[in-house]
Amino acid sequence: MDFSRQEGGMKELAGRLREIVDGVEPRLMAVSASESLVPVLRGGWSRRQVMGHLIDSASNNHQRFVRAMLADALAFPGYDQAGNVRVQAVQEADWALLVSLWASYNRYLAHVLGQLPEDKLDTPCRIGGGETVTLRFVAEDYVEHLLHHLEQVGVA
């Protein structure tokens, strides 16, 4: 499947996210529970831990999208990615549950992205003390980040 970056507005980005989820979910469900425990890179996270990270990413970005629609500017804290994965004991979580939650959350985020008004896309957003970017960048970067990790686990 070709999930390459496409030009367009938020409705197109929302459609792209739905297409990614619909294409990848069956591939993730085909990964066995035992296979999901194996690190994808030497010394790195397992597929299960990557899924936990992607759920955290969805949760954090959901708040960013909504709060930026309600404000003239957004200052949002960063988060400890490795710490989140560790304290939630993602490695012990049920694989099918993680995949199902990830897919459902991203389908909902596609709905939210489709609601982003054009006049809010330039809302300045600062995350975790980084440089200021636009809400459009945050939304597009979310999908690119998602794809990076799906490629990392071999399903995109």
Model-flagged regions — what are they?
Residues 26, 30-31, 40-41:
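A glycine-rich, hydrophobic loop/mini-helix early in the fold
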Residues 1-23:
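Extreme N-terminal tail/first-helix region
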Residues 2, 35-81, 107-110, 124-156:
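Short, contiguous alpha-helical
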Residues 16-27, 85-122:
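Acidic/histidine-rich alpha-helical segments that form the ligand environment
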Residues 1-5, 82-90:
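A short small-residue
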